[in-house]
Amino acid sequence: MDSLQNHLLIAMPSLKDTFFERSVIYLCEHNEQGAMGLMINRPIGVDVNELLRQMELDDFHTIESINSKVLVGGPVGQEKGFVLHTPQPQWSNSQQISDDLMLTTSRDVLTSLGSKEAPEQFIVALGYAGWGRHQLEQELADNTWLSIPANIDLMFNTDHESRWQKATESLGFDIWQLSSQAGHA
C-alpha cells in the first residue's frame, strides 16, 4: 500500500454527501490501520480570534490572515481542535507530517497565534475526517476521491471558497469530464 499521507483528497463532483460535497481534505495520516485528515475548505463562521476568546485564552494576539477562519475539519470529534502549520519545534503534542507541515493538538500553539512565536502559516480546524482499515482505498477505487500531492500554496494562500476549484484545476484535466463509474466503458 502506498501511503497518501501529505496528499490532498479532492471530492469528485458526483459525491453528493452533503458533508463532503466539493471538499478538499489534507491527509495527515494514512497507514494499514486507516486514515485521518482535515477538510481545508469549510469555514464554520467563527474566526480564530473568537475561538480563542471562547476558550478564555487571555494571552492571545489578534490575527489577521486568510486562514483566520476556523474550519470544519471533519465529522469526527468536532469538539477537538487541530492546528495544521508550518514547522515550529516548541509545542507539545506536535506531529511532523512532512518537511513542510506539522499537526499540533495542544493549547500552547493557539496562544502563540498572532505573535512572533506563531507558525508562519496555519489552519485551525475542529474535528477530523477518519477512515477505517481499507475504507479510503475502497472510496478511491469507487471514484469518490482523487488525490494529489499536498500543495502548500493552495492550502495556505488560496481563499477557502476557491480551494476545491483550484485543486481540480491543478489536475490538468476537466474533472467534470470524468465518469463517476469505475471500470465501465
UniProtKB/Swiss-Prot annotation:
SUPFAM superfamilies listed in its UniProt record: VC0467-like
Highest taxon above the source species: Bacteria
GO cellular component: cytosol
Pfam families from the UniProt entry: DUF179
Family, per entry: Belongs to the UPF0301 (AlgH) family.
Name assigned to this protein: UPF0301 protein Shew_1144
Organism: Shewanella loihica (strain ATCC BAA-1088 / PV-4)
